[in-house]
């Protein structure tokens, strides 16, 4: 795995606000995901609904903030001894594996309905 991803994991850990308990930390970081996702949606909405130029800088900033909070959730989950991806790179590999089962040759509506990755 990439050294950068391990550095980012530790970077996020050093910048997360401790809330008291792992449960409270998890809620804080999960709410951060929701808030940043909402800010990303707002940036896209302004472009799509109101016809404003897409603020690419803002979109990139919100995506970065999402990465921070997602890594924070990973940090908390893995600190609980749960077998889970430890870095965003691990998460990316797990997601690619899941979606490769669902869409072996690429996206199709038929494959989406069949959901080969679900029993």
Regions found by a protein language model. Give the residues of each.
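Flexible "arm" and connector segments at domain edges
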Residues: 1-119
